């Protein structure tokens, strides 16, 4: 059953599914490597390559640069609403985004005393009394 296909095929059935066409296409279209000039001859300047695989850093996308020492920054194009992260957004049944807000209980400083009575250091109301 393994060889139930064409008897004259040049390999396993899954070889046709791999990207071998892409490799042969790149080899045919690729620019031939420049010939090495003799040591006594001056080297001609290389013309700028329009290929996206050029080694100049200014032509590459900033997220594709490797070894820059800084992590790639995500683009802000995907609808970040008012600085909220995706973690804080909820999608309603209608498909709209709503911000999840945590309800916090107010903290009572010093076991029930009001902030004026608490006497915090650096309190601006402390000087007026």
Swiss-Prot record:
Keywords: Developmental protein. Residues 1-129 are annotated as: Disordered. The keyword Nucleus does not apply. InterPro entries: PRR15. Residues 87-104 have a biased composition (Basic residues). Residues 31-50 have a biased composition (Pro residues). The keyword Transmembrane helix does not apply. May have a role in proliferation and/or differentiation. Belongs to the PRR15 family. This is Proline-rich protein 15. It comes from Homo sapiens. The gene is PRR15.
